[in-house]
Amino acid sequence: MQRPIIIRRALLSVSDKTNICELAKSLLKRGVQLISTNGTARLLVNAGIHVTEVSNYTGFPEIMDGRVKTLHPKIHGGILARRNIDDTIMQQYKIEHIDMVVVNLYPFAEVVASATCNHEKVVENIDIGGTALLRSAAKNYSNVVVVVSINDYISIINEIDCNNGAVSLETRLNLAIKAFQHTATYDSQIKDYFTSQVYTDSSKCSSIFPPILNINFVKKQDMRYGENQHQLAAFYLDTRNKEKSIATTKQLQGRALSYNNIADADAALECVKEFSEPACVIVKHINPCSVAMGKTILVAYQRAYETDPTSAFGGVIAFNRSLDLCTAQEIIARQFIEVIIAPTVDQEALLILAKKKNIRVLSSGQWNKPIPNLNFRQVNGGLLVQERDLVMINLHDLRIVSQRQPTTMEIQDALFCWKVVKFVKSNAIVYARNQRTIGIGAGQMSRIDSAKIASIKAIDNKLNIRGSTMASDAFFPFRDGLDSAAKVGVSCVIQPGGSIRDQEVITAANEHNIAMIFTNIRHFRH
């Protein structure tokens, strides 16, 4: 069995100096010799902590404005030396063992993201010596303790105290894994930055989709189970994300979020973010089952719920305004709910919701314009990567192709349900009237079947389809879609267009006196 390592000598070189003085004092108190680079050493000395500067330890000064500090055989030899194997060479060159390496790196990603970023500053924040120290110490984890996270300082000191100055092999291995993960992430960030500098706008595709894709996700939490109870699962955060999203929400109350809760809440939040006026989105199994706008979110919720009360049971509700007391009371009175998500939640609303301890309440914070990013879909043996579908349309993008011009209300409903249909599984059909969905047909292999389901939902909930607007996420391949819409009383259709039978479909619209709008944008969602 591998013996524990007694800490006698430690090298400290940190960019983030949080709690480093406390760690150094604890080590010094236990008789550990401290070696440190210039900036860290200055801080420690000013705190009254005895430390040997690296340049004094090696007999070689820091040079090139600090670019070369720790890249010296006495440092790396002391870290990489194997006990009982390299002892002779150590004695020959008067190299001492370094038992602990505490390093965190220059803040490269933060510098790149800063408003004052320039290329020279970015390059100078590429840490060379620090990554070399971490890799050397992690490679020799059987003989060295490597510490990259300030969150590990206390636990390491506690272990040293409990083990007479020693750190176990298990701990050393876990710390080495963290160090290699940290350097891998760091190198990936550097690669991404230089990749963005190489490619021009004319080769945008190459810039977004490099030959090798390295993206880092950090575990936020383990889940009780995945989509089904026999599947293990966890939730990871995209380290590049700068946008308000389900990943950045704060849970204010309720049980831990499940895998399906997170998936549904993401769909609901992203859909409600499309609307500028007060809106409510209710989602079940990642599909919107009802969406409505209103003068207040209370009115929006009432209109959305009444669209499809059956499907709303056990769903996720999202708002784009602060959740108030009246709306919270209305939700509790009307239905069982898994998750409520809103930018903020009024204190009075929280107090009433606290009586229903199982309801998960999330605060997303106020969001801004969505940030272009990548969308992933894993297939067996590979990964499909595409840009997020963030295309928005407005009144000026609409192309009216029918003889009858849509009314002002029909145009408003068309723009409304076009926002909704983007979030419905294909083939997707949405009926809307007065900026409220009255029927949604999702996920059917036939577009005509999705249209039939949408009309059935409306009829079952006693909602009048006559005079409504219909949105289709993709073009109608045949006129039967328009014929079906006309039978139930649809007066306006919004769709991408682009079928080889567009003229046949336009003719059908004219025969039924339906106003038809082309967007020239498709919104498949598989």
Swiss-Prot record:
Single Gene Ontology BP annotation: 'de novo' IMP biosynthetic process
The UniProt record lists the keyword Transferase: yes
Keywords assigned by UniProt, alphabetized: Hydrolase, Multifunctional enzyme, Purine biosynthesis, Transferase
Pfam families: AICARFT_IMPCHas, MGS
EC number annotated for this UniProt entry: 2.1.2.3, 3.5.4.10
Spans traversing the lipid bilayer: none
InterPro entries xref list: AICAR_Tfase_dup_dom_sf, Cytidine_deaminase-like, MGS-like_dom, MGS-like_dom_sf, PurH-like
Functional pathway: Purine metabolism; IMP biosynthesis via de novo pathway; 5-formamido-1-(5-phospho-D-ribosyl)imidazole-4-carboxamide from 5-amino-1-(5-phospho-D-ribosyl)imidazole-4-carboxamide (10-formyl THF route): step 1/1; Purine metabolism; IMP biosynthesis via de novo pathway; IMP from 5-formamido-1-(5-phospho-D-ribosyl)imidazole-4-carboxamide: step 1/1
Catalytic activity entry: (6R)-10-formyltetrahydrofolate + 5-amino-1-(5-phospho-beta-D-ribosyl)imidazole-4-carboxamide = 5-formamido-1-(5-phospho-D-ribosyl)imidazole-4-carboxamide + (6S)-5,6,7,8-tetrahydrofolate; IMP + H2O = 5-formamido-1-(5-phospho-D-ribosyl)imidazole-4-carboxamide
Gene Ontology MF terms in the entry: IMP cyclohydrolase activity; phosphoribosylaminoimidazolecarboxamide formyltransferase activity
Domain of life: Bacteria
Domain MGS-like: 1-148
Cellular compartments per GO CC: cytosol
Family: Belongs to the PurH family.
Domain notes: The IMP cyclohydrolase activity resides in the N-terminal region.
Protein name: Bifunctional purine biosynthesis protein PurH
Organism, as annotated: Baumannia cicadellinicola subsp. Homalodisca coagulata
